[in-house]
Amino acid sequence: MFASPIARLVQQLGKLPGIGEKTAARLAFHILRASPEDAAALAAAIAEVKQKIRFCSVCCDLTESDPCAICRDARRDPGVVCVVAQPQDVVAIERTGGYRGRYHVLHGVLSPLDGIGPDDLRVTELVARCAGGPAAADGSGGDQSIREAILATSPSVEGEATAVYLAKLLRPLGVRATRIATGVPIGGELEYADQVTLARAIDGRREM
């Protein structure tokens, strides 16, 4: 049996995705072996991110300032929005250096088996953005409405179902719904695709 403080640390680390009890125990003992300064820095970083990071009121990405830097950037095309499942996907696409539109982060995909429906995602906010409102909350980028939504959810069963659902919602709003090309492996996660493959997938997007 672990001492109570260690057991509590293992329990909390075990709540992280992909972390089982054995891995949580290894992480806990790594922290115990770390210097007091490193352990304190880890705790401070966790506290800081919970205190300072929020959702962008425009695109729902994670940000320290609101609206986020991408939504405030007047050099980006406010009429094209790339719809992704997770904040990590924004980072992956930005690494390609070829996309100059804006984003909308759903924070998940439709998964009926897991009890995740449209109300659990940032779908309402996307529809509101595509209904003809300004491109950014602070007015940056002018008042051009969204004309194209690039549906860039991963090509898994859930990702495809989410893209089809969103396309049906957006078409009546006069928004062109396109889907990234299948350069990304079927069943793969967007954040793990290499930069060239991801750039070609966006360039080769197709109508939904």
Regions found by a protein language model. Give the residues of each.
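Extended, structured, electrostatic nucleic-acid-contact surfaces
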Residues: 1-17
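Long C-terminal interaction/binding lobes of large macromolecular proteins
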Residues: 2, 99-100, 127-150, 154-208
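Extended interfacial segments that mediate partner engagement and assembly in macromolecular machines
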Residues: 24, 72-153
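Short metal-coordination and nucleic-acid-contact micro-motifs, chiefly zinc-binding Cys/His arrays
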Residues: 49-52, 64
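Short cysteine-rich clusters marking metal-coordination/redox-active sites
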Residues: 56-59, 68-71
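Short functional micro-motifs and their immediate structural scaffolds
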Residues: 63-65, 76
